[in-house]
A protein has these predicted regions:
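N-terminal auxiliary segments of SAM/dcSAM-dependent transferases
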Residues: 1-89
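A structural motif
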Residues: 19-20, 146, 210-211
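Conserved beta-strand segments of alpha/beta enzyme cores
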Residues: 22, 53-55, 81, 126, ...
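Active-site regions of enzymes building and remodeling cell-envelope glycoconjugates
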Residues: 50-59, 92-96, 230-238
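SAM-dependent Rossmann-like transferase core, predominantly class I methyltransferases
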Residues: 62-122
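Structural motif
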Residues: 92, 126, 188-189
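Conserved SAM/SAH cofactor-binding pocket of Class I
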Residues: 100, 104-182
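S-adenosylmethionine
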Residues: 115, 154-250
Length: 251
């Protein structure tokens, strides 16, 4: 994918249609190569396969994980090293095993959400992570001092992956399979790294859930006005690689 906006649309579209998708991005000579991994029974929609040149390869789970082992080396975000467990690490690092779930820390939307969480007073707070994927945001919040953290995802594979990652980091987090539209209760902080249309559809759910702070990410910059029109002007917005994340503060 040579056009940056096309790349963003492709990734957002794939993530929306296949929420348990694992992926890696490689950049070479101005071209982004997106490797995405789908379950064996998943069928790629024709509108995607016709728009971009796509090569399909068959992997069993072990081949896929072996392939990731050679490609995912980790990243440094908001002062925290995010690493796979096979890399040399220390207690302060956040460990993520790249399973079939979104969130290794390499994508800008995840990084922007982490940046916003890093500036919040999380010590002793409760946090709900909606669409938790690999659990990366929830685990980060727990390691930063949140007293109670809950992560929810509609996809059971993602929840399994998140539970595995919580064990890797020796943190106690409640991960549950749940429909975001049915969420109730109140949490000091709510994070949601989703796609724009889903965030817009969940506005009436997300806002009452957040007692103090609401973090929204997964938003291409071109959707800035859509989010502001629905949620209002943010307390803070951060940008990176043509993506944007919003922080709302309840007063």
């Amino acid at each position: 994918v040579e056009d940056e906006q096309d790349f963003e649309k492709l990734l957002a579209d794939l993530h929306e249609r296949f929420p348990n998708m694992g992926y890696l991005v490689q950049n070479a000579n101005g071209t982004s190569i997106v490797e995405f991994y789908l379950p064996e029974d998943a069928k790629l929609p024709e509108d995607i396969s016709q728009r971009w040149p796509i090569e399909e390869l068959g992997y069993d789970n072990q081949q896929w994980l072996d392939d990731l082992r050679g490609k995912f080396k980790g990243v440094n975000v908001a002062g925290t090293r995010i690493l796979p467990p096979w890399e040399e690490h220390c207690e302060d690092d956040l460990l993520i095993y790249p399973g079939m779930a979104f969130g290794t820390g390499e994508h800008a939307s995840t990084q922007l959400a982490l940046v916003l969480l890093s500036i919040l007073p999380l010590q002793g707070k409760s946090l709900l992570d909606v669409g938790t994927g690999s659990g990366i945001l929830a685990i980060y919040a727990k390691k930063r001092g949140c007293s109670k953290v809950t992560g929810v995802d509609i996809d059971p594979i993602s929840v399994e992956n998140a539970l595995d990652n919580a064990k890797l980091n020796d943190v106690d987090i409640s991960f549950e399979v749940a429909d975001a539209y049915e969420l109730k209760g109140e949490y000091d902080v709510v994070s949601a790294n989703l796609v724009t249309d889903l965030l817009l559809g969940l506005r009436e759910v997300l806002q009452p859930l957040a007692r103090e702070f609401l973090v929204l990410s997964g938003i291409p910059f071109e959707d800035y006005d859509k989010i502001v029109e629905s949620f209002g002007e943010p307390y803070l917005a951060v940008f990176g690689e043509d993506w944007i994340a919003f922080l709302y503060r309840r007063t």
